[in-house]
Amino acid sequence: MGESKQEHLIVGVSPFNPRFTPEWLSSAFQWGAERFNTVDVLHPGEISMSLLTSTGTPLGRAKRKVRQQCNRDMRNVEHALEISGIKLGRGKPVLISDYLQTQSYQCRRRSVIAEFQNNQIFQDACRAMSRAACQSRLRVTNVNIEPDIETAVKYIFDELPAYTHCSDLFEYETAALGYPTEWPIGKLIESGLTSLERDPNSSFIVIDFEKELIDD
């Protein structure tokens, strides 16, 4: 896939994650440019607020912190582009929150929620992943509370349509969403244990600078 350079790489960036430094992003952009026609960036934007509110941050403060973090991440992306000399295919990062209210995205999000309500395996996986994310956040903030998992899972509801239909979101014929680690919910979808499916024109890869491209 990457060797033919016929597809587009979309680098997923997570807020509040120290991995996504300008140096790491620069390496990811260069890595992608060697394997794909274009490189782009996908960022959650304001939907990451649910992670903060589910771990005790008041709504008003959560909004401010998310805006600040998003701006910080965008500066890191710009710095990484300067270091690498790469230009994004879409010209600028794409924020999931900018597309959340579109008809197609809302339709796919409703499908995710319906799966959560009707599939115990999917529900358990979403809750487990959300709890792990909350616990990681609580360790960073040194707060000892029980996280609100029902709020936290909304982050997955908001993100998943971008995972399953990244090519459509970016208006590319084909595209691969790249991230430095596997995504457990994505692996569950690929297992066939849910009714959710990934668009055949969209794929997921693990970005690993030391190994060959890993494609699931």
Curated annotation (Swiss-Prot):
Gene3D superfamilies: Cyclodipeptide synthase. The record marks 65, 75, 155 as: Could be involved in aa-tRNA binding. Keywords: Transferase. Pfam families: CDPS. Its EC number is 2.3.2.22. InterPro entries: CDPS, CDPS_sf. Belongs to the CDPS family. It uses activated amino acids in the form of aminoacyl-tRNAs (aa-tRNAs) as substrates to catalyze the ATP-independent formation of cyclodipeptides which are intermediates in diketopiperazine (DKP) biosynthetic pathways. Catalyzes the formation of cyclo(L-Leu-L-Leu) (cLL) from L-leucyl-tRNA(Leu). Can incorporate various nonpolar residues, such as L-leucine and L-methionine, into cyclodipeptides. This is Cyclo(L-leucyl-L-leucyl) synthase.
